[in-house]
């Protein structure tokens, strides 16, 4: 969920990594369509779709929107859709505060593995440090 800057970067990275299917969701239809068009042009092998009717069969659900952050809607997807979330799905959220967002708490209660926003941010900081030369490449994995 979320097709802005963060969500776009995550979607692009997943497509570069070789996923075959990607479902996109954003509250703004124009933002969703722009990302869909860019991904379709660069990754024609990826089957793109809008919000699915079920989460059954998905390997990964990522919130790349501010949903769950203080002052924003608590869940990035409709509750009825989240009720279809299987325990085998990994759920990640980019929101850094609170550490465990309502989405992650819901997923954890369903038995899913989760990745918090701070965990995702730390991984990006290591990569950025390597990119600018502040962290030697060999230390990046252990840092």
Model-derived features: positions:
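Rossmann-like adenosine-cofactor binding region
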Residues: 44-115
């Amino acid at each position: 969920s979320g097709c802005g800057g963060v969500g776009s970067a995550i979607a692009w990275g997943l497509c570069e990594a070789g996923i075959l299917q990607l479902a996109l969701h954003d509250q703004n239809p124009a933002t969703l369509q722009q990302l869909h068009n860019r991904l379709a042009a660069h990754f024609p092998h990826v089957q793109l779709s809008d919000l699915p009717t079920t989460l059954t069969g998905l390997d990964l659900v990522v919130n790349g929107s501010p949903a769950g952050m203080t002052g924003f809607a608590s869940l990035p997807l409709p509750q009825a859709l989240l009720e279809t979330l299987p325990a085998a799905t990994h759920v990640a959220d980019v929101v850094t505060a609170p550490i465990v967002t309502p989405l992650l708490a819901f997923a954890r209660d369903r038995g899913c593995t989760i990745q918090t926003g701070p965990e995702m941010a730390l991984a990006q900081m290591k990569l950025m440090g390597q990119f600018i030369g502040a962290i030697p490449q060999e230390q990046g994995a252990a840092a």
